[in-house]
Amino acid sequence: MAACSRTQVISLYRMLIKESKKFPSYNYRTYALRRVKDSFRENLHVDNPKTLDMLLNQARENLAVIRRQVSIGQMYTAQRTIVEETGVHRDL
């Protein structure tokens, strides 16, 4: 991987992680974070420039999808799950 491509990949990875953390729903947020990390880890050793360009374009498209879905999720919020509840702890 060339130095320029490496910086692009790292920047894109960080943007995907940052945007995935914005999901209001716990389930979508954890799923998106897991998928981003797994797909980058899976393609860590790709050296072919054509394959690398294809993967970068695919990641950019996924970033656009994540941004769109975060916006939709923020417009139509749902109740928080028990996993997301913080503050009051009951002793059983």
From Swiss-Prot:
GO terms for biological process: iron-sulfur cluster assembly. This is LYR motif-containing protein 4A. GO terms for cellular component: L-cysteine desulfurase complex; mitochondrion. It comes from the Eukaryota. PANTHER family: LYR MOTIF-CONTAINING PROTEIN 4 (PTHR13166:SF7), PROTEIN C6ORF149 (PTHR13166). The gene is lyrm4a. Pfam families: Complex1_LYR. It comes from Salmo salar. Belongs to the complex I LYR family.
